[in-house]
C-alpha cells in the first residue's frame, strides 16, 4: 500500500466522538452517493471497497439501523460532558444533586451483551487497540470520569486542545510512584499536618488559618515546582491568601520552624534566617501579621537554579492575582536591549491559589484571567488551584455562588478544569501532572479545584458549629488525609503501622526542638523600625544636562519613519510641528513632545519603560501617538523603538478595559524588575478609584508593611473642564491622604519642561533606596496649551522644581496665590489679561512632599505681603485644601491673612452642566484675583 493510499484509508480512524454522525452519513451515501459532500464520497467509496479499512465503522453500520449506535454515542458524550457530576471528589459532606443527566448504560436502553458486540473504536479512536469491545471501553470511561478526578473540558472551543485533553484523560495512565516516593509523599503530609497540630496545641487560640482539610496543597505545589525544574523553568511566582499560607512558607519556601514559632512568640525571627542566603525575607518598619508575609527561596533543583517567590498579600482576597501575573511577566521579559522586549514564557510561571468562596465572589479574578492571552500581559499559562473547603467564613456554597462549582466562572476563558478529591493524594498529583503537560503544550491557564473541607473555624478562635452544625458533625469524625494515606500505605505493605506513628512523632520532636531554641526573653521591644535614611528626603532632581544638538538628534529620529510608511496626513501635520522648537525661535515643546524627549533620554540611560492603559498608545486625548499606523496597510511603527544609542526597551500597550487588574499587574512587574520604569495611565483619572485596593494595600503601604519597594508611576488625567462629575477629578485628595513617611511623590504640573525633568528624576530613582511611587495629575486641555509649552532651553539643563513663579517685584507684592495644575494656568491667563503687580501666582508643582521650605523662603522675600490664598477648582472637601491647610497655616502664622477660593463643599466632584461649570469656574478666578 502506498503512503498516499494509507493516509486516505486511515482517515476514518479519527471519527472518535463524531462516529454516530459519520454512520448516518455513510448510510445516506449507500442510498444516494450524491447526498454527501464530494470529499466524503471519496472516503466512503474507499471504505465500501476495502473491508480492511475502519472495521468499527462497517461493523457497526448495520447496528445503527435501530439507533443502537446513536444511543451509545449519546452515552459516551454524556459521560464526557457530565461524568463530573457523579465523580468521587468529596471527602466529606457530598452535595445532593437535584438534576443529573443520564450517565448509566441502562439509561440508554443498552446492556453488556449489546456493547460487547460493538468495537471499542466507537468510544475513542485509540481504544480499538486497547480494549476488546465498547463495553470494556465504557467501563474504563466511567471509572475515569466518575473517579477521584472530575474533568471538565468539553466547554473548550478549540478542537485541538479538547482532543488533546480527551486523549490524555482517557488513555490508561496511573501516577507511577514507587514505594520510596510514596513514603516521601506520606512524610510531606506528616510534616504538613504535624505543623498545624503543634501550633494548635502550643498556641491555643492564635490565628493561623490552618490548611487542614486541603493538606494536599503542599505536595501539589512541590510536585509543580519539581516538574518546572525538570523543564528548566527558573522562576516560580506564587500568590495566595492567608488560608494555609504558614504551611506553604515552611514546607515550600522552607522558612525555618524557629522563625515561624518566633513570630507566634513575638520574638525576633530574623536571628534564625538561614545564613546561606537561600531564603530572602524583607520587612517594613510597621510590619504585618505573619499570615500576610511572603518570601523568596533560591534552590538548585534537577540542575535548574530556581527562584521561588511567595508574594506578600493583604487580607483582601484574590487581589494578589494580577500582582503575581505582573511579577511573572517581568521575569519573562528581556528589557536590556533596544526596541521592544522579547518575552520567553519558559523562564517563569505563575501559581495562583484561590479560595472557593472568593474565586467566584471577587471580580478581580475575571479581570486577571482576561489578561491571559493578551500580547502585553500573557504569561504563558497560569496554574490556578482552588483550595476548596466548601465554606467562606460561615457562608455555605448555596449562599456563596449561583453556579454548580466555584470554578464555573473560568469556563468563559476556555480553560480546562479538574476537580480532585483532596483525600486522594495520588489523584492530586496526577491532576498536577496533566495540568503541567497542558500548560507546556498550549501555554494556557489550567484550573484545579482541590475539593476538601475546613477542619476548624475560619480562624482558630471561631466555633463553626454555631452556624454550620451539620457539616461539622461529619468533619469532626473524618480522618485526616495524613491518616488516610498512611493507612493506605500500611495496607499496601509499604510502611508498617509502627513506622507511620514513629514518623508522625518525629515531626513533633523536630518542632519541639525548634521551639526550645527560642528565648522568651528576646521579646521585640522596638515598636518602630527605622525607615531607610533615603526616605528622609523628597525625590531628588536629576541634574543631567543635554546639548541642543543631542535633543535635536533624538527629536529627528522620533520623526523619521520607514520608507513607504503612510501616516495619516492630518496626524503628520501635528507631528511635523515637533520640529519647530529646534528650528524656530518661538517654537515650544508641548506636553506630549516633552514626554517623548524624556522617554528617549531615559532609554539612552539604560532604563526600560513600560507604559500601559486604556488607549495609551495614542493617548485618550489624541496627544501621544507613540504607535503610528500606516493608513493604507494598517501596519504599525513605534518611533521609541528606534532611539539613537538606545540601551533599553520601550514597551507600550493599550490595556483591556480594566483598572484593578492592570494596575496590579504593573505594580507586580515593577516589584520584580525594579529597574523598569512602569507607568499606568488612566483613561480619565476619575476611573482610577477602580484600583483603590491596589493603591491602599500595595502601592502606598507595601514598603512600610513588607519592605517591598515600588516605583510605579500613575498618569491620572485631572482637571475641571465642564465634562461632569465623572470626567473631572482623579480624586487628588485620596492620594494625599495616603501620602506619609515620604512613601510617594504627588504632583500637579503646569510646565512641560518640569514634566520632562520629573520623569527623568523618577527614572533615576529606580532600583535604589530612593524609589517610590509617583502620582501625576496629568493634563487634558493643557496638553495643547501654549502657556504650558516651554522653549527647548528649559530642557537642556536644570531639574525638577517643586514650585514655579513668574518674575515679580518683591516690594509690590501684597497677595500670594498658591494654586496647582490647571487652576494655576487659568489664573495666569486671567491675570495676563488684567495685569496686577500686587498679585504673585505660585504654582505648587509638587504637592507631596509639600514644599514648605521653598514657600517659606519665597514669602520671606516679600516685605509688604498681606494675604496668602489657596485657590483650587475642586470642592472644599476635595482636592488639596484639607491637606495643604495645616502646612500653609504654619507658614502664614499670624503674619498674613489666609483665605480659600474654590468650590464649596460638595458630595459630587463637579457640576453636570457645562455652562454652570463655566459660571462657577469664572467666579472662583474672579474672587481669587480680587485684591481686597
UniProtKB/Swiss-Prot annotation:
Pfam families: E1_dh, OxoGdeHyase_C, Transket_pyr
GO CC terms: cytosol; oxoglutarate dehydrogenase complex
EC numbers for this chain: 1.2.4.2
Cofactor: thiamine diphosphate
GO BP terms, alphabetized: glycolytic process; tricarboxylic acid cycle
Catalytic activity reported: N(6)-[(R)-lipoyl]-L-lysyl-[protein] + 2-oxoglutarate + H(+) = N(6)-[(R)-S(8)-succinyldihydrolipoyl]-L-lysyl-[protein] + CO2
UniProt-listed SUPFAM superfamilies: Thiamin diphosphate-binding fold (THDP-binding)
One GO molecular-function entry: oxoglutarate dehydrogenase (succinyl-transferring) activity
Stored InterPro entries: 2oxoglutarate_DH_E1, 2oxoglutarate_DH_E1_bac, DH_E1, KGD_C_sf, ODO-1/KGD_C, THDP-binding, Transketolase-like_Pyr-bd
Keyword Disulfide bond: no
Keywords assigned by UniProt, alphabetized: Glycolysis, Oxidoreductase, Thiamine pyrophosphate
Biological function: E1 component of the 2-oxoglutarate dehydrogenase (OGDH) complex which catalyzes the decarboxylation of 2-oxoglutarate, the first step in the conversion of 2-oxoglutarate to succinyl-CoA and CO(2).
Entry similarity comment: Belongs to the alpha-ketoglutarate dehydrogenase family.
Alphabetized HAMAP family for the sequence: SucA_OdhA
Quaternary organization: Homodimer. Part of the 2-oxoglutarate dehydrogenase (OGDH) complex composed of E1 (2-oxoglutarate dehydrogenase), E2 (dihydrolipoamide succinyltransferase) and E3 (dihydrolipoamide dehydrogenase); the complex contains multiple copies of the three enzymatic components (E1, E2 and E3).
Name of the protein: 2-oxoglutarate dehydrogenase E1 component
Species: Staphylococcus aureus (strain MRSA252)
Encoding gene, per UniProt annotation: odhA
